[in-house]
Amino acid sequence: MSNITADDVRKVAHLARLDLPEDTIATYTGQLERILDYVDQLQAVDTEGVPATTRAVEVVNVTREDKVEATEVREDLLEQAPLREGDFFRVPKILAE
């Protein structure tokens, strides 16, 4: 059985960038403890000889051949841009130098 404390819940919430109201900490403590108890049960299951997998059903990508097609909408699209610099969209800077 896991021994989860209120401080453990606060730490997990902090790491996950969650602002948990103090009156919910006890509820989350119990829930997290039950989750970890379930994980302990799963760890005890004998999986010898069972192949590792990431999903129950195989997934494949459906692809199509790329086709280059001429279009006349370039200028129409550029005219709709809130900010434009020549033949390019101008976007706000998001990364610091």
Curated annotation (Swiss-Prot):
Coiled coil: none annotated. It comes from the Bacteria. The keyword ATP-binding applies. Its EC number is 6.3.5.-. Keywords: ATP-binding, Ligase, Nucleotide-binding, Protein biosynthesis. Transmembrane segments: none annotated. InterPro entries: Asp/Glu-ADT_sf_sub_c (IPR036113), GatC (IPR003837). It catalyses: L-glutamyl-tRNA(Gln) + L-glutamine + ATP + H2O = L-glutaminyl-tRNA(Gln) + L-glutamate + ADP + phosphate + H(+); L-aspartyl-tRNA(Asn) + L-glutamine + ATP + H2O = L-asparaginyl-tRNA(Asn) + L-glutamate + ADP + phosphate + 2 H(+). The keyword Transcription regulation does not apply. It is an enzyme of class 6 (ligase). GO terms for biological process: glutaminyl-tRNAGln biosynthesis via transamidation; regulation of translational fidelity; translation. One of its GO terms (molecular function) is ATP binding. Belongs to the GatC family. NCBIfam families: gatC. Heterotrimer of A, B and C subunits. This is Aspartyl/glutamyl-tRNA(Asn/Gln) amidotransferase subunit C. It comes from Synechococcus sp. (strain WH7803). The gene is gatC.
